[in-house]
Design a protein with these regions (language model features):
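N-terminal polybasic/positive-inside topogenic patches
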Residues: 1-22
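C-terminal edge-of-domain segments
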Residues: 21-31, 140-239
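Short, basic/aromatic recognition patches
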Residues: 33-57
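A generic local secondary-structure boundary/capping motif
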Residues: 47, 126, 179-182
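Hydrophobic/basic alpha-helical segments enriched in Actinobacteria
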Residues: 51-54, 77-81, 92, 100, ...
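A short, structural micro-pattern
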Residues: 52, 67, 78, 97-98, ...
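Short beta-strand segments
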Residues: 52-88, 103
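Short, structured beta-strand-loop surface elements
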Residues: 88-152
């Protein structure tokens, strides 16, 4: 197992050097949703949402088809990259990297019934739909040197610990000697260098204001996700 880890670490270092030499794939960026009404949110808000969420689905093209992993991540201060880690045994960690990747960050979502738009005589021929918030971070996924892992996991846990009210933040200093190193050997660090940010905030913007307001009123009586969407639907449009 140790020999495998050493071989893998050498490969990671070689990949990092290859990226430093300005290796760059061709990345074609297409809108997540074809309707421009749902793509009016600013880059800053899309990034703020992604930073606050801190969790997404990472996907790359594998030799036998798409590979995906659900990962926590830490967005850099200037939003030029997102750092994350994967289990050594994860097929995505063994993909041919650096390479194009997509990190999909999802927010609240909920079903929309046509009945909520109003009487059929006033709003005829409506169909069910789904409202949601999602941001796609596209870029180049590269392995990081193994020595970057300790700092990454400490910064990641610190970010989320400081959000918890009412307790002293947990740190890896609480772990027994050697335990952290044993666990770190089971994961690998990666960095997504962000090339494009694409957000979809599908909130019935293609409906008249009064119709949208009725749907929001109905959603406000639903579960937490429905209420979150209702609150977003009631916000004033960005200018």
């Amino acid at each position: 197992l140790r020999a495998f880890a050493q071989r893998r670490d050498k490969k990671l270092a070689a990949h990092a050097v290859r990226f430093d030499k300005r290796w760059s794939p061709t990345i074609t960026v297409r809108p997540m949703h074809p309707n421009p009404a749902f793509r009016q949110t600013s880059r800053d808000r899309n990034l703020a949402f992604s930073r606050a969420r801190g969790f997404g689905i990472l996907s790359v093209n594998g030799p036998d088809g798409p590979l995906a992993a659900h990962v926590p991540f830490l967005l850099s201060e200037d939003a030029s990259f997102a750092d994350l880690h994967l289990a050594r045994s994860n097929p995505l960690a063994r993909a041919d990297l650096p390479g194009p990747a997509l990190l999909a960050v999802s927010g609240p979502d909920t079903y929309i019934s046509p009945d909520w738009y109003g009487p059929h005589a006033q709003v005829p021929d409506q169909v069910p739909t789904w409202n949601y918030v999602a941001v796609h971070l596209r870029g180049v996924l590269e392995p990081l040197p193994p020595q970057a892992l300790g700092t990454h996991v400490d910064e990641l846990s610190a970010e989320h610990e400081q959000r918890i009210i009412g307790k002293t933040p947990w740190t890896s200093a609480k772990m027994t000697e050697g335990a952290k190193d044993r666990m770190l050997r089971m994961i690998l660090p990666f960095r997504l260098r962000i090339v494009a940010v694409d957000g979809t905030w599908k909130l019935n913007q293609n409906k008249p204001p009064e119709v949208r307001a009725r749907a929001a009123e109905a959603l406000a009586k639903g579960d937490a996700a429905a209420q979150a969407i209702a609150a977003l639907m009631r916000e004033k449009p960005e200018t």
